A protein has these predicted regions:
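HotDog/MaoC-like acyl-thioester-processing domains
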Residues: 1-20, 102-111, 115-166
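Hot-dog-fold acyl-thioester-processing enzymes
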Residues: 2-95, 158-166
Length: 166
């Protein structure tokens, strides 16, 4: 007799699994490096000296002479840290961002920790089998300071018929 093994595929949450008010903590964090900053900044053609020119940045007031991490890299990493837990294989579309802010700088060597709060969800009026989920992504550094925040609307699949509940 052959024993059937249970297989579990890593995925994000189906629409029905999101709970408004729940905070999802995404671990591990990600330490931001100089290599990350230079690569992302040059790939995106952002020539801002605050990201690339160490000598120039050293003469600028306000950041202790250090170069800043590119804020778009910070935002991308913040969202990326949430993917495995929330949207891997279940998202249909990223509908947009609002209320994006970077209240404190991120510097080389800082570690970004992400958390996401589901702030709203509703069934799609035009796309049966899908729903709109509003997520607030919050990034904190290794000291617990909020360094990034963004509200994002996503279109998420509902649980397929016949799919087992966890």
């Amino acid at each position: 007799m052959t024993e059937q093994r249970k297989e579990v595929v890593q995925r994000g949450l189906w629409f029905e699994e999101y709970e408004v008010g729940t905070a999802y903590l995404h671990r591990p964090g990600r330490t931001m490096t100089e290599a990350d900053n230079v690569l992302f900044t040059t790939l995106t053609m952002n020539t801002q000296a605050l990201h690339l020119d160490a000598a120039w940045a050293a003469e600028q007031p306000g950041f202790g002479g250090e170069r800043l991490m590119n804020s778009m890299h910070t935002l991308s990493t913040l969202v990326g840290l949430s993917v495995a837990q929330l949207t891997q294989g279940t998202i249909v579309a990223n509908l947009g961002f609002s209320e994006v802010s970077f209240p404190k700088p991120v510097l080389h060597g800082d570690t970004l920790y992400a958390e996401t709060v589901c702030t709203d969800k509703r069934e799609s009026k035009s796309r049966p089998g899908e729903g709109i989920v509003t997520l607030e992504h919050i990034g904190r550094n290794q000291h617990g300071d909020i360094v990034a925040r963004a509200v994002r609307k996503t279109l998420v699949r509902k649980r397929p018929a016949g799919e087992e509940t966890a």
